[in-house]
């Protein structure tokens, strides 16, 4: 975009229709600062949807039943920690577009967690909300400040930048047992937390299994997948 070429965008109209956070986020997400870009209204719609989903996820998470000793959240807590690491690195290098991309990814991961879980420890709930709001704050200060103050009754601007837990960065693996009609045929070292569709894809690609040959597929997460013919 260039004023001399007459193809600039008036921000005032987008403030009114999409909000300042969505506009700021889209500008940062469009491309690296050194690159020229073509404005796309569909792109700002995408960042607005992301912010709406972020708000919805935090609200849903805040209402999740708190259960001491719950270990349901091990994987999502690790993913948040990985996001602290990646977003911090990208911001330090002024790679704003990839920082936004990482935040969109962790927001999708949180959506999956909320879809499949009904409880969480208070410690993990607080950790996730505090860190995700803090990571997104430089790029979307209005929505994150409001969400943060509503949950913690604190000002987000006074919150320290999150620190990476270096011991909780690497995804642990387990030995997946692949059975056919209840008999073990293969094993594979696999990341924990994979969904059934992801495990089926591994079996199809790596072990040349034709999934349509089987009448039923039984999947026990992080343990066994059994193909019944």
Question: Across the structure, where does each feature detected by a protein language model lie?
Answer:
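Short solvent-exposed loop/turn micro-motifs enriched in small/polar/acidic residues
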Residues: 7, 169-171, 210-211
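A short local loop/turn or secondary-structure capping micro-motif enriched for an aromatic residue
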Residues: 10-11, 165-166, 194-196
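Helix-rich, typically C-terminal accessory recognition domains appended to large enzymatic cores
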Residues: 13-189, 218-221
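Generic structural signal for well-ordered beta-strand positions
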Residues: 1-2, 185
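NTP/phosphate- and nucleic-acid-binding module
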Residues: 66, 176-229
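Residue-level structural signal for beta-strand termini and adjacent loop
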Residues: 4-7, 189-191
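An acidic, gly/pro-interrupted, aromatic-rich
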Residues: 2, 8, 30-34
């Amino acid at each position: 975009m260039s004023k001399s070429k007459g193809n600039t965008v008036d921000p005032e109209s987008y403030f009114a229709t999409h909000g300042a956070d969505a506009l700021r986020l889209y500008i940062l997400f469009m491309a690296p600062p050194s690159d020229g870009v073509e404005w796309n209204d569909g792109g700002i719609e995408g960042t607005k949807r992301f912010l709406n989903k972020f708000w919805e996820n935090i609200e849903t998470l805040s209402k999740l039943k708190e259960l001491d000793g719950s270990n349901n959240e091990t994987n999502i807590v690790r993913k948040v920690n990985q996001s602290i690491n990646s977003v911090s690195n990208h911001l330090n290098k002024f790679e704003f577009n990839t920082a936004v991309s990482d935040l969109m990814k962790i927001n999708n991961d949180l959506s999956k967690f909320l879809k499949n879980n009904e409880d969480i420890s208070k410690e993990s709930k607080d950790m996730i909300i505090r860190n995700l709001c803090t990571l997104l704050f430089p790029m979307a200060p209005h929505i994150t400040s409001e969400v943060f103050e509503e949950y913690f009754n604190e000002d987000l601007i006074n919150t320290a930048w999150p620190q990476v837990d270096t011991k909780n960065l690497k995804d642990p693996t387990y030995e997946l047992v692949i059975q056919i009609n209840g008999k073990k045929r293969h094993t594979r070292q696999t990341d924990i937390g994979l969904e059934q569709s992801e495990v089926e894809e591994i079996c199809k690609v790596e072990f040349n299994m034709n999934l349509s040959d089987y009448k039923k597929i039984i999947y026990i997460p992080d343990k066994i997948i059994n193909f019944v013919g």
